[in-house]
Amino acid sequence: MAGAKEIKTKIASVQNTQKITSAMEMVAASKMRKAQDRMAASRPYAENMRKVIGHVAQGSLEYKHPYLEVREAKRVGYIVVSTDRGLCGGLNVNLFKKVVADVKKQREAGAEVEFCPIGARSVQFFNSFGGKVSAHASGLGDAPKLADLIGTVRVMLKAYNEGTLDRLYVVFNKFVNTMSQTPVIEQLLPLPKSEEDEISHHWDYLYEPDPKELLETLLVRYVESQVYQGVVENIASEQAARMVAMKAATDNAGELIDDLQLVYNKARQAAITQELSEIVSGAAAV
């Protein structure tokens, strides 16, 4: 059995770690609330933009934008949004597992894949995973702006415009609630048709002055908005996962301290018993 002094040192070490994890839990909770506010503010815009674009994809247009044309998926691109930091449970691992499974299906179907990782963990993973990394971004912080993503996203849009990509997906952790974050893969291009069950007719639009000019701007803005929404959803998911992970670490540290305290008490009791025995033996010898 370890000595009482050694156990006391271990207890102090675990207590210091517990203070750190407890502080990180509180910081994550504060950041999560702010991230949720940003996510809630941008989600209606992204969802309504998706609905409008879905109607456009179903409409009858004289001008067919390349983003509306369905091509054979020979080359597939993934914009993968991860965290910059760790200590957030299995958030990134689950996301990467989902991407890898989907990539496997695409490769089995004969498609080539390339990646655009956003977030330091994603950049690190795909640099070692194998496959072409066309662009990347990291260090966006807890309050990213759309302008921080435009350059990276447009690299993938350029590849799609030039025909070097036939499909484009965005992958991120969707925030469900504090205890649940779900990795999702959403198709960006070609534009998916609206999935609303209540649609009973097709929408026709009048474009002024020119549908080509309007759609060029609108469709690019749509893709950028969906990627941005994925980033803010992922940040909210990250902070929620980190808060839960740090709470679990704090609770585990408390249990470990209790166990070590019990061992310490036993060691101290054994030391006292031994000292008493030595005193009694010494007195008997005299």
Swiss-Prot record:
User: How does the UniProt record describe the way this protein sits in the membrane?
Assistant: Peripheral membrane protein
UniProt protein name: ATP synthase gamma chain
Q: HAMAP family from the xrefs? A: ATP_synth_gamma_bact
- Where is it mainly found? membrane
Q: Per the UniProt entry, what are the Gene Ontology biological process annotations, in alphabetical order?
A: proton motive force-driven plasma membrane ATP synthesis
- The scientific name of the source species is Shewanella loihica (strain ATCC BAA-1088 / PV-4)
Q: Which GO terms describe its cellular component?
A: plasma membrane; proton-transporting ATP synthase complex
Supply the Gene3D superfamilies for this chain: 3.40.1380.10, ATP synthase, gamma subunit, helix hairpin domain (1.10.287.80)
- What is one Pfam family matched by this protein? ATP-synt
Subunit structure and binding partners:
F-type ATPases have 2 components, CF(1) - the catalytic core - and CF(0) - the membrane proton channel. CF(1) has five subunits: alpha(3), beta(3), gamma(1), delta(1), epsilon(1). CF(0) has three main subunits: a, b and c.
Instruction: Please provide the record's keywords in A-Z order.
Output: ATP synthesis, Cell inner membrane, Cell membrane, CF(1), Hydrogen ion transport, Ion transport, Membrane, Transport
- GO function terms (MF aspect): ATP binding; proton-transporting ATP synthase activity, rotational mechanism
Q: Where in the cell is it found?
A: Cell inner membrane
Q: Which PANTHER family match?
A: ATP SYNTHASE GAMMA CHAIN, ATP SYNTHASE SUBUNIT GAMMA, MITOCHONDRIAL
